[in-house]
Amino acid sequence: MIEIKHLCKSFGDKEVLKDISAVFENGKTNLIIGQSGSGKTVLVKNLVGLLEPTSGEVLYDGRNFVTMTKQEKVMMRREMGMIFQSAALFDSLSVLENVMFPLDMFSSMNLKERIHRAQECLDRVNLIDAQKKYPDEISGGMQKRVAIA
């Protein structure tokens, strides 16, 4: 569960978030909507730890993100993800290679294990048949599912 309490975020004199409180329960889908420039992205970046609040708290299962050790933050971030408005895929890599990219960079798996893991992820989002295609060959919705995988 993620809970935010009295969250405020400012950039210099500009207050972007003011006294926001909310609870995001595990297993539930939440929607954050608002006008352009209303602070949605700043809020989400605070939720996933890409920004730290000016004041207030962001709690993960009751633990304050700001007071976590670097290792605790790394472990917490492994449990969450964020998909940007554009899917942020590499145009020069196939769907499979895009999914494998973080494994290539940050895991000690061998090539066979990385391919297998990436194919499992693609299967979960019903894109196993698109693994050899490139981002410009699939729909925007499919690109988002690649980003999820």
How should these model regions be labeled?
Residues 33-35:
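The feature captures the beta-strand-to-loop junction immediately N-terminal to the Walker
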Residues 48:
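Helix-to-loop junction immediately C-terminal to a conserved catalytic motif
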Residues 56-64:
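Conserved ABC transporter NBD signature motif
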Residues 63-64, 111-129:
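Conserved ABC ATPase "signature" region
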Residues 65-81, 105, 111-112:
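ABC ATPase NBD coupling module
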Residues 93-101:
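Short coil-to-helix segment of the ABC ATPase nucleotide-binding domain corresponding to the Q-loop/switch region
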Residues 134-138, 142:
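Conserved ABC ATPase signature
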